[in-house]
């Protein structure tokens, strides 16, 4: 089925590479009203956090998010799995536990066979089952390009919400998954991805960030986000701006998908890399020793990427142990946060 119709050829973009560039999005959002009139809204759009959080009572807050995009892979079932995993990740990124999902489905019904659409939806439902939540309904439209995703809802204790704006100077940055998803997606779209590279792509993008719920219970985890369409640098900048801090990243410590390295050195990657780098402007400074391909990897649009945690230095081992125990073998320290103007410096 996926060989007859390549999903990635039906859309102009794929995965979180479809996101509007950070600078453009900021311009679009700047006229929206602030949330001061809603004291129970614990997290709104002000710091570009991963999900909205609304306090229900002293013990519970609801976490609400939506995420959808066009295909990053050709296989319909895998596309559904990736999109669902990516959407649910925003619940974990707030330290929450998912409880419910609704499907968002836009499909070119005159182009794409019903059987393929069914596989996409089945893929999403399979991930909800793994997460232990119902896929309780949703909404469908006839669209010119395939679009799939979820509305995801979760619960978190109001005092355990992990905002991207609560990091502290001296915090150590821990990244949970390797980078390179967008690069492999672009390679696949070009017909150059072998079976092993595809396995790496699917394994990382369908791994639920379940460790976020456990991280939410740790006082030493001060801030949390997931790395998606704006790349590592873009989402780290959101932490810096929200928390009023600067960051230092060591490029040589970054975990990378092995199959993505050579393609990155060839300059392969989604158009979102260039858009992201342009949006960062002088808020990101690279040491001269950092090669161009590594700079691009750090701006690569990740789909269903890893959690990025700002952790008190004396609890780093505990946090890494949590990641590793839940199957995030690549999790490692990649940098630190410091007092200073909101910016990111990258050294070799």
PLM features per residue range, with description:
Residues 1-348:
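Helix-biased detector of long, well-ordered alpha-helical tracts
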């Amino acid at each position: 089925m996926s060989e007859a119709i390549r999903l990635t050829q039906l859309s102009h973009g794929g995965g979180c590479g479809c996101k509007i560039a950070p600078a453009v999005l900021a311009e679009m959002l700047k006229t929206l009203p602030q949330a001061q009139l809603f004291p129970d809204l614990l997290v709104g759009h002000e710091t570009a956090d991963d999900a909205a959080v609304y306090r229900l009572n002293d013990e519970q807050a609801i976490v609400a998010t939506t995420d959808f995009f066009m295909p990053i892979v050709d296989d319909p079932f895998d596309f559904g799995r990736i999109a669902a995993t990516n959407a649910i990740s925003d619940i974990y990124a707030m330290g929450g536990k998912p409880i419910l999902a609704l499907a968002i489905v836009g499909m070119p019904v005159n182009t794409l066979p019903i059987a393929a659409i069914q596989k996409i939806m089945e893929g999403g439902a399979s991930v909800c089952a793994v997460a232990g939540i119902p896929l309780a309904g949703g909404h469908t439209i006839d669209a010119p390009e395939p679009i799939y995703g979820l509305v995801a809802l979760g619960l978190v204790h109001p005092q355990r919400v992990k905002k991207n704006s609560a990091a502290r100077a001296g915090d150590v940055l821990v990244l949970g998954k390797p980078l390179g998803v967008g690069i492999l997606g672009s390679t696949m779209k070009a017909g150059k991805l072998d079976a092993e590279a595809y396995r790496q792509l699917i394994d990382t993008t369908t791994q639920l960030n379940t460790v976020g719920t456990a991280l939410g219970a740790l006082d030493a985890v001060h801030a949390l986000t997931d790395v998606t369409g704006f790349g590592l640098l873009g989402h780290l900048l959101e932490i810096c701006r929200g928390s009023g801090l600067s960051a230092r990243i060591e490029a040589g410590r970054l975990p990378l998908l092995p199959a993505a390295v050579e393609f990155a050195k060839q300059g392969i990657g989604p158009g979102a890399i260039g858009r992201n780098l342009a949006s960062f402007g002088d808020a990101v400074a690279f040491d001269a020793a950092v090669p161009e391909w590594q700079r691009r990897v750090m701006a690569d649009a990740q789909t269903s990427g890893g959690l990025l945690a700002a952790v008190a230095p004396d609890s780093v081992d505990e946090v890494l142990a949590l990641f590793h125990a839940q199957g995030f073998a690549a999790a490692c320290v990649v940098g630190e946060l410091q007092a200073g103007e909101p910016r990111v410096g990258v050294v070799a």
